[in-house]
Amino acid sequence: MSTTLGVPRPDQASYMLRAAASDAGRAYKQRLLELLDVRAGHTVLDVGCGPGTDLPALAERAGDTGAVIGVDRDPAMLARARSRTAELRRVEIREGDAHALPVESGTVDRARTDRVLMHVTEPLDVLGELRRATRPGARIGLAEPDWDTLIVDSEDLETSRAFTRFTTEEVVRNATVGRGLARLAGRAGLRVEAVDATTPVFRDFQEADHTLGLGRNLRKAIDGGHIDRARGRDWFAGLAQGPFYASFTLISVVCSR
C-alpha cells in the first residue's frame, strides 16, 4: 500500500501537544482539572506527564507553596517537559514507570493520569501505585478513551466498523479501559466521587487523520488482512472528500483516597 495514505506518524510529543490544543482536548482537560480541585499548597503528581502539557496549569493552581511532580519513562518526553517548565521552580520532572512510581508513600494531595492506562501493562497495578503515593483524603483524576465507541461516518458502514474493531483489537493495548475506570478504581481501594463522559467530535478530516491515525492504522489493517485493500482505499478516499464526521467517548473519573 502507498505510504501516502494518511499523514505520517508524528513524533509522540508533537502528537500529544497538538491533541491537547484541539477544542476537544482543551474541553476535557479543563473539566478534569476542575474535578481534581487542585488548591494552593498541594503536592500534585502527573503520571505519564509526556512533554509537560498539563504541568503549567497544575503549577498555577498549586501556587508558590505547592509542588508539582511530573513522571514519565520516556527520556525524550522528559526533556520536552523540563524545557516546558524550566521557569517553574515548583515543578520537578522525574523519570519512572507508572507501575513503580518514584514517589514516597502518602506524600501526594492530588494525582492524575490522562490517556495513560490504555497503554500500560497492568492498569490495576498503576491505580494501586497512585493509592500508595497519595495521602488519606487525596483526590485522583483519571481520563481514558473507550475506543470501542469510535464512530467514523461513511456510506460503507461495514468498513467503518472493521476499522474500529481493528483499533480496539490490534492497535491499542487497553482499548476499552475508559468504561472500566470506576470499577477498577473500586478494586484498587479508591472511592469514586465523580464520573464524567465527553464526546470529542471531529469535522475536519485532516485533524481527525492526525489525531485518530485513520490512514496509518488503515494501512496496518490492510497489510494484516483485516480490511480489503480496494475497499479500504475507497473508504479512505470517501472520508477525505467529505463531509466528514468522527467521534469517540472519553471517560473521566475522580476518586478519593
Predicted feature locations:
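A short acidic, Gly/Pro-enriched loop at the edge of an enzyme's catalytic core
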Residues: 99-110
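A short SAM/SAH-binding and catalytic strip from SAM-dependent methyltransferases
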Residues: 109-123
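Conserved catalytic/acceptor-binding region of the Class I
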Residues: 22, 139-205, 220
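Conserved alpha-helix/loop element of class I SAM-dependent methyltransferases that forms part
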Residues: 23-40, 57
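Class I SAM-dependent methyltransferase SAM/SAH-binding core
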Residues: 45-47, 51-100
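A short glycine-rich, Lys/Arg-flanked "PGG" loop and its adjoining helix->strand segment in the class I
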Residues: 124-139
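N-terminal, positively charged/glycine-rich alpha-helical extensions of SAM-dependent methyltransferases
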Residues: 1-15, 26
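Conserved Class I S-adenosyl-L-methionine
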Residues: 191-257
